[in-house]
From Swiss-Prot:
Tissue: Expressed by the venom gland.
Keywords: Disulfide bond, Ion channel impairing toxin, Knottin, Neurotoxin, Secreted, Toxin, Voltage-gated sodium channel impairing toxin
Keyword hit for Cell inner membrane: no
General function of this protein: Potently inhibits Nav1.7/SCN9A (IC(50)=98.1 nM), and moderately inhibits Nav1.2/SCN2A (IC(50)=216.3 nM), Nav1.6/SCN8A (IC(50)=313.6 nM), and Nav1.3/SCN3A (IC(50)=491.3 nM). Hyperpolarizes the slow inactivation, but does not alter the voltage-dependent activation or fast inactivation of Nav1.7/SCN9A. Binds with Nav1.7/SCN9A at the extracellular S3-S4 linker of domain II (site 4). In vivo, exhibits dose-dependent analgesic efficacy by reducing pain responses in rodent models of formalin-induced paw licking, hot plate test, and acetic acid-induced writhing.
Chief place where the protein resides: secreted
Family: Belongs to the neurotoxin 10 (Hwtx-1) family. 10 (haplotoxin-1) subfamily.
Organism name: Cyriopagopus albostriatus (Cambodian tiger tarantula)
The keyword Metal-binding appears for this protein: no
Disulfide bonds: C2-C17, C9-C24, C16-C31
Name under which the protein is recorded: Mu-theraphotoxin-Ca2a
Length: 35
């Protein structure tokens, strides 16, 4: 399963939910909306 908003993630292995327009923040290391 992919990671939801605000979940901890690894920028080099981005598992955030692309279908929800989420990306792993390089700076904060959590999934945020790619606006």
């Amino acid at each position: 399963a992919c990671l939801g908003f605000g979940e901890k993630c690894n920028p080099s292995n981005d598992k955030c939910c692309k279908s929800s327009s989420l990306v792993c923040s390089q700076k904060h290391k959590w999934c945020k909306y790619d606006l």
